[in-house]
């Protein structure tokens, strides 16, 4: 589901770049991190609340699980609406703060304000991507997400390719897709269905909400930090390469969304199983899930890295083939950036795994170091030490540093959760 959700931005980028030019393309890429920032509450309540719901189900408390589920959906909708209003009011100031040039400013404000219309459905869509597998209906979530993504693609073709509406058309297509993705699950749960989660009467339980926030703090930190770091990348790239740097980085990010979404999607999808087995104290199965997941992520990591290196030229041609200088910069940057895919999946899974175990603190530490501290240091330090081109390796170095922390957490917590890949035999008596 995460992969299909990321297609929204990928398709928008293709049509905006090829049908409107690199100035509007750069404008969209400049404001995109802020727009993604508005939806992070869905990740926090989704992953953090999902861990509580799955554990509650594992304990056999079905009605309580339904109450928590309904409460978190309602709360997410309320917060999503507040973020929509805040986004609309602050958009011009945000665009100026991000350093938009005079040519980019109006385009960025216009695109941002249209996208803000679907902030509430977008947060709900992210939330339900966590809850539908727990409800025993992952196929429903996938079906809805595919329909939303296909709708977005068709409308992009019509609005941007045929009607020539430019970024207005691209934004309208995305808003429509996100509304389908976020509101369709609401109607599904309101109708008669066979899922293990149901809407029901509830009272706000601030203790549970607080626990969900703590559990989901790592995912919140991951997404907040990613947006902040992307803004910093854009600032550095504007200084080093100008408009071309932001456009090249944007091209990489569109495909990065898809690749990272594969890791996030797997981590979120496996979380209910982890939470359930943790709640039922099935430690043997918990270790089995962990080991198999590491193997799956390893295969994904190698495949994605090879694909990125080999297809960098084709990707750049699709997006920015109309500008030779921008094309060459994008190919070089993408190949350097793609080395991070060998590592990133393990860190994402490690953080999500601890969230599913209701250990929000360790999960948050991993996410904070990976997505904020290490990347900020690298994005500023590496260009100073090795030259401007080293900025494209900042994420790889940051992921390597995080991997060391993730592995140390796994081995130090082995006695509590039985996580180690190395079998530790019980001492004979």
Each PLM stretch: what is its role?
Residues 2, 14, 51, 92-93, ...:
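Transmembrane alpha-helix boundary and packing residues in multipass membrane permease domains
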Residues 4, 8, 38-42, 82, ...:
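Residue-level hotspots within pore-lining transmembrane alpha-helices
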Residues 53-118, 162-217, 274-340, 381-425, ...:
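Short alpha-helical transmembrane segments in multi-pass integral membrane proteins
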